[in-house]
Amino acid sequence: RGLGDVYKRQAASKGIKMMMHHETSASVRNYERHLDKAYQFMVDNGYNSVKSGYVGNIIPRGEHHYGQWMNNHYLYAVKKAADYKIMVNAHEATRPTGICRTYPNLIGNESARGTEYEAFAGNKPFHTTLLPFTRQIGGPMDYTPGIFETHCNKMNPANNSQVRSTIA
């Protein structure tokens, strides 16, 4: 059928299941309007997990990612996904509160600075060593590896810094 099917077959031949990505681009109400169709599409096409993204200022009112309005949305999306037996890995979502114990289909939240921050802000070398003892107390974490070029000036000539890491 399509290129996605080619990738799914290749992954399946190696014992790997594909995860669908739903990037909302911060248009949360629009995403909510389409959740049933999106989740049904996933079920119909053999996807049982989704990584949902919320990059940007939340539309329509500029809500905060960690505010009550968005917390209500995250819970709504996780409950709706449970109805379809879909696992959720929420990216740019709120820090975990323990709802993964009530909704075990919530398999992870990012809610931590991954190495994608190295490109523009940098993380301290010890940052990732602290996460299991700080961030992961609240629940499972999605850590985004994001950057593999350690010399930032190769991506941005004005940035002469190097990724602070033990990777040479």
Residue ranges and their predicted role:
Residues 1, 19-20, 45-62:
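Short acidic catalytic loops
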Residues 16-31, 78-99:
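Aromatic-lined carbohydrate-recognition surfaces of secreted/lumenal glycan-active proteins
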Residues 30-44:
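Short, acidic/polar
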Residues 9-13, 37-41, 72-83:
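Alpha-helical scaffolding segments of alpha/beta enzyme cores, especially the outer helices
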Residues 12, 25-33, 61-72, 78:
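Alpha-helix capping and helix-loop boundary segments enriched in small/acidic/polar residues
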Residues 86-168:
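Glycan-recognition surfaces
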